[in-house]
């Protein structure tokens, strides 16, 4: 069983997406004309700015710009024996005394969607840049392609780098440690989060 870990409610601090440490190089595919956006560093040291509520979560999410967790969360996963974890420390520019340390998580695990079992079809595929469109915007339930899984516990989901997919071992560790600002969805609701559950 796989799970998607997501952020929690708005009472927590959140990542200011306007002041991100990642930028993009953009170009157009000469075959189909679609925009190709390649992430790049915009600063030597990854920096973030926090806004919002008074509480600091263990999960910060910046959409396609990356997944940011507290260092404590990563340590909890590692102590549980989780595999597939790589990360870079992040500097909080408006750091306060109680601000925890944060890291930019780079999942080394991989698993993809079973498009056929999820009744999703790719259309208008471009052989040059690899981009395509889906025939369904909200497929449900989503099925995982188990043959695509590389066996690691902390994964990215196919073409969706903002989706943090984990095994039961990681979810159990998060629950035991009572990590803050985290919710999760079970396998069938991965990607579309129709039924978020609090950790």
Indicate where each model-derived feature is located.
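Phosphate/anion-contacting hairpin/loop surfaces
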Residues: 1-199
């Amino acid at each position: 069983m796989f799970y998607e870990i997501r952020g929690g409610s708005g009472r927590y601090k959140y990542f200011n997406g306007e002041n991100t440490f990642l930028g993009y190089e953009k170009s157009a595919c000469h075959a189909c004309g679609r925009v190709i956006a390649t992430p790049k560093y915009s600063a030597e040291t990854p920096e973030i700015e926090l806004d919002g509520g008074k509480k600091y979560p263990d999960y910060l999410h910046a959409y396609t710009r990356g997944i940011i967790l507290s260092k404590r969360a990563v340590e909890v996963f590692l102590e549980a024996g989780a595999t597939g974890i790589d990360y870079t420390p992040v500097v909080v520019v408006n750091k306060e005394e109680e601000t925890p340390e944060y890291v930019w998580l780079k999942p080394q695990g991989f698993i993809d969607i079973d498009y056929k079992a999820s009744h999703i079809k790719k259309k208008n595929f471009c052989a040059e840049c690899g981009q395509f469109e889906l025939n369904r915007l909200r497929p449900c339930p989503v099925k995982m392609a188990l043959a695509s899984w590389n066996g690691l516990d902390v994964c990215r989901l196919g073409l969706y780098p903002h989706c943090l997919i984990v095994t039961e071992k990681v979810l159990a560790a998060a629950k035991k440690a009572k990590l803050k600002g985290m919710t999760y969805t079970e396998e069938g609701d991965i990607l579309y989060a129709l039924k978020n559950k609090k950790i």
